[in-house]
Amino acid sequence: DAERLAEAHRTKDGMIVHVVTADQVYNEFSSGTPDATAYRWFMKMFYDRAVVPGTENTAGNKLPRYLLLFGDCAWDNRMITSSWQGYSPDDFLLGYQSNNSTWETYSYVTDDYLGLLDDEDGASLEYDGMDIGVGRFPVRTATEAKQMVDKTIAYMQNKELASWKNSICFVADDGDNNLHMTQAEELATKVETNYPEYLVNRIYGDAYKWETTATGHTYKQATKR
């Protein structure tokens, strides 16, 4: 399915797309040991080959533009904690966790790190700028992978010009003293101010009734938005 998506981009967008396995990347860039930084070094290889000092702007058509990770990740890459017992690392790609891992609100897993390709980048995720777009399909099975690729290709081939293509949805809950809702609202306001052509929808969990079910808590009304 990864190759099927790559071929769709080659055909429709004229992109040069490489499909590689995680083991291939580990073998070349981390001596065969699974390491999230190996993904970054892999992309930096293409980046360094394209960038000639003093001609970055003129070499832009040769620079790598995107990295798509085809697999889910876990905060416990080694899967040695009880939360991940029973899972196989072979079914996941790795994720990069921030340096501060002692506080839940300051520790996070991010793929942004993989897009920091300049020589001086990587020491500060807060201030370094990404050089490529990084995305991830958080799939764990072949069925999930096929579904994601089917949806993506359907989106690429959809020629219907309607308002749905201009819609942006911000979803947040009230955890961590409303931090997530505050950040979502800041981003939504920035989009409305700088890109008025977009239709911004907000779905904030705390604005809906909290219902308890046999499987846990949910905001049923929010799922209908």
Please tell me what each predicted stretch does:
Residues D1-R225:
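Cysteine-dependent hydrolase recognition
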